[in-house]
Amino acid sequence: MIEDLHWLGISWREGPDRGGPFAPYTQSERRGLYVEAWKRLHEAGAIYPCTCSRKDVALAAGAPNDGDDEPIYSGRCRPVESVVRPARPSLRSGLAGRTNASAATQASPDSPAGFNWRFLVPDGEEICFTDLHLGPQRITAGRDFGDFIVWRRDDVPAYQLAVVVDDAAMGITEVVRGADLLKSTARQILLYRALGLQIPEFYHCDLVRDEAGVRLAKRHDSLSIRQLRDGGWTPEQVRSGVPPGKH
């Protein structure tokens, strides 16, 4: 990836290939930062242990799945004292009173290992931010997304927590990414707030799509930059999206 970015003409002052004051850049070397963030969330009562598998969540009655986004969690392991989300009552059907009390009693306050840990979202709260490209955004917790995983049972931080911790530690002030991650931004804003961190600005790019309107993605066997490069594309053609032989 780094080689492909250089080929495209993109440069940077600091990174894995150059070093710099914000090293290390490999997440396996930054574990201490993630564990510290997990402890702060745990002490604040902002997260809870969960034993549900991905299959459990996907098969939960009425659990919606918005394309590439994860299904909204039914709340089976949610603490009983938390407020039942009103936006999607069907998710609670047959699950009332069935929270996993054993997970809460077995989980260690000093280590996240052995459980999925979910962030307890404020149901009904609108997460508002102004995107630098798409303008004002309003995403509702508990309706557009549910309690999400911040630490996985295989003892590694989940994407949402890792990127928040890394961006804050590295002094990132602007985040540029695809428009398919708007809901992830809402989740991450909640984490920034819970951890008392400065929230960066966001710019969500339009997605690159094929002739059928499907976004280009590895899971769909879409061509990679390396394949385009090997196929005779120039950096200018890749940046403009105009293939060789066309003007």
Regions picked out by a protein language model, each given a short descriptive name:
Residues M1-D68, A179-D180, S184-L197:
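N-terminal Rossmann-like or analogous alpha/beta NTP/dinucleotide-binding catalytic cores
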Residues R54-S90, G94, T105, D110-A217, ...:
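Active-site cores that bind ATP or allylic diphosphates and position pyrophosphate for catalysis
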